[in-house]
Amino acid sequence: MRIQLNTIDLQCIIALSCLGQFVHAEANREDLKQIDFQFPVLERAATKTPFPDWLSAFTGLKEWPGLDPPYIPLDFIDFSQIPDYKEYDQNHCDSVPRDSCSFDCHHCTEHDDVYTCSKLSQTFDDGPSASTTKLLDRLKHNSTFFNLGVNIVQHPDIYQRMQKEGHLIGSHTWSHVYLPNVSNEKIIAQIEWSIWAMNATGNHTPKWFRPPYGGIDNRVRAITRQFGLQAVLWDHDTFDWSLLLNDSVITEQEILQNVINWNKSGTGLILEHDSTEKTVDLAIKINKLIGDDQSTVSHCVGGIDYIKEFLS
């Protein structure tokens, strides 16, 4: 596939300058700290999406970065608009001020955060992975996937299949970093490289963003908003990742019973993962319980799918 871009589109992708135009957990926190999402931990991504010439010219690099992507300054990011909250990790929520509106620590949401839906709907994090294809084979409706940039460039065929079948794809950062614990520059790097992975693989720029571990506060929001991104959280957590642990905090049957209970109300966004075969098998069982009357995040709130889609 050869991308056909006009001058304005090319400038928009390279500098992300077009983005300025668009501009509840249920388990014990100690259990949550054991998360193992099992996305590929590599020194350098096993690249399958070619590193585009326009990105090489802009960044000075020749290949996709490893798990710690370099910060590339962007002229539209206004650091004066970013509040000066202290960085914190997942083990120190007691020191996080309430006015920072931390979702992970205080279950706080802002006016533009999406955290529920009028139809009970599944959402999937951490892909694309080899297991994602099994889930796609099952889905008879459009769903929302929040993809890691490092996985997008390794599985462009799966990413493009999701796109072709009408699923909504949002950013989940480049390499699954807990954003409140890193500098402003590192947050920007995680976002910009995830967007560039989507640009290069799917010819589009995301509107929707889900922070890894639900780690978002008003410092993180002040940065992601400048990219035109809107945060998507959740009000139903399956804790499916815990099934990968030797000492799981919840059983599969308990998860399925929770879904049955949630389905009685018929509303909400469910957090799941398509990163492993085990979580995908569970997702298929959940899908059978809920059925096909589900919505993408954009349809839940009557929003757009993407900020920009480039012709190919």
Swiss-Prot record:
Keyword set includes Magnesium: no
Assign the protein's first listed, main location to one coarse class: other
Temperature effect, per record, is: Optimum temperature is 50 degrees Celsius.
Q: Recorded E.C. number(s)? A: 3.5.1.41
Q: List the disulfide bonds.
A: 117-300
Q: Which GO terms describe its cellular component?
A: ascospore-type prospore
User: Which catalytic residues are annotated?
Assistant: 125, 273
Q: Which UniProt keywords apply?
A: Carbohydrate metabolism, Cell wall biogenesis/degradation, Chitin degradation, Chitin-binding, Cobalt, Disulfide bond, Glycoprotein, Hydrolase, Metal-binding, Polysaccharide degradation, Signal, Sporulation
Renumbered to this chain, the signal peptide range is 1-44
Q: How is it modified after translation?
A: N-glycosylated.
| Binding-site list for Co(2+) | 126, 172, 176
Q: Which residues form the NodB homology domain?
A: 118-307
Top-level lineage group: Eukaryota
Q: Where do the record's glycosylation annotations fall on this chain?
A: 142, 181, 199, 246, 263
Tell me which cofactor or cofactors this protein depends on: Co(2+)
What GO biological process, any one, is recorded here? Answer: polysaccharide catabolic process
Similarity section:
Belongs to the polysaccharide deacetylase family.
Its function, per the record, reads: Hydrolyzes the N-acetamido groups of N-acetyl-D-glucosamine residues in chitin to form chitosan and acetate. Chitosan is a component of the spore wall.
Subunit structure and binding partners: Monomer.
In Swiss-Prot or TrEMBL terms, this protein is called Chitin deacetylase 2
